[in-house]
């Protein structure tokens, strides 16, 4: 189960495109077609999801749909319904649909991108309303879960200060504005639940060893490479422990 960029990480992992997200992040974060002021003026979105889930995904660094489809692993991608302000969960059996709409919707950051249309509904980033969907994983039948956090242990998310600006910019999407402004409460509650489940032995938690100080639109490739190497080291360090946890 993946949220926002995590859904793309999961799709690439299931398809055994193990360095795909690394290459996208490092090699294209400064590409004007992908993430730039120029894109904002030309395409109406700072992060050009149309290019990301178009030319980049189908021509430059394609997902291995055949491996994904035959993996026997089910991906769940979380997105937020713009009308209801509630999370919704999508289970793509393959990645053949043009534009990968479920992954695209899961990554659609308000303000930085446009909403994504699926079945006549508009969706935004799943992290707004279910940032750490551990409860959903259990509801889907998982008995044990591995949770990968992007913040250090002890992190507490603070409320956004520019509330009036958020409401003004997102006046077309009142429910999304509400979700943005209340996200800190949801996130902190979910963190508490994750650590409670860790104590009970229901989940294995991987958290960064240091504060990452990374923006959602980070462009410093040295910093991004450092973060990737930190995560890779954490994976190697915990690989055997995870195997034992899942078998136990």
What function would you assign to each model-found segment?
Residues 39-47, 86-91, 121-124, 178-181:
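Flexible, glycine/proline-enriched loop segments at strand-loop-helix junctions
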Residues 190-248:
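C-terminal helical/tail subdomains of lipid-metabolizing enzymes
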Residues 33-37, 170-171, 209-218:
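A short small-residue
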Residues 1-59, 91-105, 149, 153-161:
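Patatin-like phospholipase
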Residues 70-148, 153-167:
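Active-site gating loop/helix substructures
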Residues 62-63, 130-134, 189-192:
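Glycine-rich, charged/polar anion/phosphate-binding loops
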Residues 60-74:
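A short alpha-helix-loop-beta-strand transition element characteristic
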Residues 144-202:
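Helix-centered, glycine/charged polyanion-binding patches within enzymatic domains
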């Amino acid at each position: 189960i993946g949220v926002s960029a995590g859904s793309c990480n999961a799709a690439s992992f299931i398809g055994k495109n193990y360095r795909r997200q690394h290459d996208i992040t490092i090699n294209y974060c400064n590409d004007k077609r992908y993430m730039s002021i120029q894109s904002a003026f030309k395409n109406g979105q700072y992060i050009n999801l149309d290019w990301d889930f178009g030319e980049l995904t189908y021509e430059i660094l394609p997902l291995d749909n055949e491996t994904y489809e035959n993996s026997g692993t089910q991906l769940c991608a979380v997105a937020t319904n713009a009308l209801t302000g509630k999370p919704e969960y999508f289970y793509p059996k393959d990645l053949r649909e043009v534009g990968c709409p479920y992954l695209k919707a899961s990554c659609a950051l308000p303000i930085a991108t446009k909403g994504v249309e699926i079945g006549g509904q508009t969706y935004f980033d799943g992290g707004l309303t279910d940032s750490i969907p551990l409860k959903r994983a259990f509801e889907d039948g998982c008995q044990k879960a591995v949770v990968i956090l992007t913040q250090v242990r002890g992190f507490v998310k603070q409320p956004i200060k520019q509330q009036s600006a958020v409401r003004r910019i997102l006046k077309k999407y009142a429910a999304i504005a509400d979700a943005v402004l209340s996200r800190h409460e949801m996130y902190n509650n979910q963190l508490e639940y994750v650590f409670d489940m860790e104590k009970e032995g229901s989940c294995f938690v991987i958290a960064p060893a240091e504060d990452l100080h990374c923006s959602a639109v980070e462009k410093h490739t040295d910093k991004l490479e450092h973060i990737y190497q930190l995560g890779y080291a954490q994976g190697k360090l915990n690989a055997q422990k995870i195997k034992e946890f899942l078998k136990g």
